[in-house]
Amino acid sequence: MARPQIVRECGSRAFALLAREVLWLWLRRMSPTAPLQELCLTISRDRFARLLEILREDGYRLVGPTVRDGAIVHDTISGAGDLPEGFGESQERGTYRLESRGDRALFGYAVGPHSWKASFFAPTVPLWRARRKDGSFVVLEQGVREQPPLALIGARSCDLHAIAIQDRVFLEGDAVDPAYAARRRRTFVVAVNCGRAGGTCFCVSMGTGPRATLGFDLALTELLDDRGHRFVVEIGSEPGRDAIARIGAEETTPEDREAADAVVARTAEHMGRQMPTDGIKELLYASVDHPRWDDVAARCLACANCTLACPTCFCSTVEDRTDLAGEVAERVQRWDSCFTMEHSHVHGGSVHASIKSRYRQWLTHKLASWIDQFGTSGCVGCGRCITWCPAAIDITEEVAALREAPRR
């Protein structure tokens, strides 16, 4: 892939240049230098554990799945021993339950409440901090903090598509986010193909899974049977190739290749949900006055859980804070949601004063105007907005109702 030309523009030129360099490196990783069939290798569970060790030795902070507070969440891990061995989960709308699988699978779950969004688009980002001094103030901190290199362990295909979408949001165009660019600058991704579908997943409908096809350095398929516990590995980048060379790997046997393909095929056949996307943009644009909006508004709490759990939602706001003595002030950027009244507040009131208008705005943007804005849907089919909605609202059911119910 050819390196893109850097356009010299006014404003934050340094940030724009850095962001475009990050995006070029990431897109380069999406194009393996050899066919996947030639890059297919197998490593044992012990060698997988060694892979995590060498990433730590190289200075990466490992972030991966672990069990905490009754859920499989993303957090800093020290190695394979922190992974959710033997755990899976049951998910339905408004319901999540951690379950024991009865085996030693490390990645035997679908997706938890956390996406990888927070790793790059942090929930809170300090912009500057100052202290009062001699009738004026002194800036204590300003600008983007240096970030350690990050290794994502166990990223699923839907979430890799979500990261690619957020790259478009934060790294392309004139408004480049410097904090996001700094976090994305050095990232190593160990993807895992899904071995089971969650009860609310519909990645097949969205074309985003269950097999990882982009944005990874290494993609693993976990196999656990009478021939042992092992991982079939696809290499997606030169850093990935180098890492595998350091731990050693064996050529994948035809039996393991077939077993790995069967794992992904079985997952695709057992999706918990489906959402046909044919004509979905036109459907949403034509449904502004659909009676279904009143129905969903009667159930929606406007709590913003769906937008917080969503791996692509990117609304934020800026706050100024002071300490109780008024001596120290800071400005921070934090996550916001289009479901809050303040999000659309302008002089004279809120543009979206009702829950009806806020839900309609969210769904229309996610599935329609997002396509016009960024060239892709804003939904990757992870199902988190269904699982973590306390009112048990199901986005796939709402879209189906818009298709079937009569318009006013």
Describe the role of every protein-language-model region.
Residues 24-26:
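Tryptophan (W) side chains
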Residues 297-307:
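Extended amphipathic alpha-helical segments enriched in small hydrophobics
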Residues 277-298, 316-408:
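Ferredoxin-type iron-sulfur electron-transfer modules in oxidoreductases and energy-metabolism complexes
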Residues 305-312, 316-321:
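A donor-sugar binding/catalytic signature common to diverse glycosyltransferases
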